[in-house]
């Protein structure tokens, strides 16, 4: 297993009126982050919050290329990012959802206290696959065929690449002590965006290089 210290290359916020970042995603232009009663769009080039939607946003956030998906309580909402209208709602299995991401037609949801990641049918919420973790799951993302998730244990957080079939940990990036992660997303290239929990911040972390191959977003989970 590869181990390294996480390299934080950017930090945004805190933002006025936002006490906690609960989930995070990226639409190719804006970083969207959940803050309880709003979904906020952040321009990572300027660090400015440019838009907000009034929706319940208490946990993970995802983007499928057109729509946003937002965990809230025991459900997942599908949201029009332009109007903020909730289009459909599906059940979130078992409650206690944390991270959320989209990869090639399915949703992937982290369960915090159950230490699990579920692959879900986005139409019904049915569980298609479950991966076990040995730490609390606080975020999940796919990039270039790699499944990554964020963890928390005490004051320690890390980002870890895992085998999507077995859950075996293949690589870890250790965050500084006391720096938590609440939501994880890739920009499809050389960085991850991480929610900063009660700090109210969003952080960018450098993604490890894979030879000369450039990233291009979420890839098919084999």
What are these language model-derived features?
Residues 12-37, 59-60:
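Beta-strand-rich domains and repeat architectures in extracellular enzymes and scaffolds
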Residues 26-28, 63-65, 102-104, 142-144, ...:
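Residue-level detector of Asp-centered blade-edge/turn motifs that repeat once per structural unit
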């Amino acid at each position: 297993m590869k181990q390294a210290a996480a390299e934080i290359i950017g930090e945004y916020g805190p933002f006025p009126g936002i006490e906690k970042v609960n989930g995070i995603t990226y639409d190719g232009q804006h970083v969207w982050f959940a803050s309880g009663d709003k979904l906020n769009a952040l321009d990572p080039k300027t660090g400015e919050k440019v838009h907000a939607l009034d929706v319940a946003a208490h946990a993970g956030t995802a983007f499928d290329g057109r729509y946003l998906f937002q965990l809230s309580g025991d459900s997942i909402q599908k949201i029009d990012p332009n109007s903020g209208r909730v289009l459909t709602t599906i059940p979130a299995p078992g409650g206690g959802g944390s991270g959320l991401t989209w990869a090639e037609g399915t949703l992937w949801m982290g369960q915090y206290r159950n230490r699990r990641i579920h692959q879900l049918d986005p139409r019904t919420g049915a569980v298609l696959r479950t991966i076990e973790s040995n730490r609390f799951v606080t975020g999940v993302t796919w990039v270039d065929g790699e499944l990554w998730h964020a963890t928390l244990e005490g004051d320690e957080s890390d980002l870890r690449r895992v085998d999507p079939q077995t859950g075996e940990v293949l690589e870890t990036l250790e965050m500084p002590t006391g720096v938590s992660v609440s939501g994880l997303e890739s920009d499809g290239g050389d960085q991850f965006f991480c929610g900063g929990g009660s700090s109210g911040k969003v952080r960018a972390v450098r993604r490890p290089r894979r030879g000369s191959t450039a990233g291009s977003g979420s890839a098919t989970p084999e």
